[in-house]
Amino acid sequence: MLLFFAFGATHTKGGSSNHAALIEINGVIGEKDEVNAKDFFESIQRAYDSRGTKGIILKINSPGGSPVQAGMINDEIKRQKKLHPHIPVYAVVEDICASGGYYIAVAADEIFVDKASIVGSIGVLMDGFGFTDTMKKVGVERRLMTAGSNKAMLDPFSPVNSKQQAFVQEMLNQVHQQFIQVVKDGRGNRLKDSPDTFSGLFWNGEAAIKLGL
C-alpha cells in the first residue's frame, strides 16, 4: 500500500476514548540500541492495556540490526495479535524499513510506505577485516593459543580457514532462511514471485509495493 503522509499521531495514555496507539520503532535494532525487545514489549503491552485502543500503528524508521531482537519483537506482535484479534496492527514506514526493520514490519496486518521509502534488504550480514598481509609487511608475528580447534574462528590476524568459512556461511544461510520464512508467513500471497526479493536488495516504496513487500 502506498501512503503519502505527514505523520503526527500520538499515543493516548490510559484514556477511554477510541484511538489508535502509536509505537515508534526508530533507529538501530539491538539489545543496547534504540530499538530493543524489552522496551518494545513494554510499549505494546501499554498500547493493548490502554482503554479505547482500536488499532496499533508501528511507525518504523530503522535500517535493521540484530536478527534476534527483531525476531523477538516479531514474535511478540504475533502473540499479542492472537490475544487481541479485533485490534489491527499497521506498520507505517518513514525513511527506511530495511533488514531487521522489515523483519518487524511483516508481523503487521498491513504495511504502508511513502513512494520514496527504502524497503527490503532481506538478507544476513557478517563482516570483518583481515590483517595478515599488513602484519607481514611490518614484521609482526601473531602468537595465539587456544583450547579447541575452532576457538579462534574468524580471527582477523590469522589466515582464512576454508572449513571455518564454510561453517559460518552455512550458519548465515540458515538465519537467512528463517528470515525468508518470516516474510512469507507475514506477507502471504501478496508476495510476487521474483528472484530478487530475498537477495538482499532494497527498493523504494513504489517498487516494493509491486513486489508485494
Regions found by a protein language model. Give the residues of each.
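Short, intrinsically disordered, charge-balanced linker/junction segments flanking boundaries
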Residues: 1, 211-213
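Small-residue-centered hinge/linker elements
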Residues: 1-87, 96-186
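Glycine-rich beta-to-alpha transition loops that act as phosphate-gripper elements at the mouths
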Residues: 90-98, 197-201
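Secondary-structure end/capping motifs
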Residues: 179-210
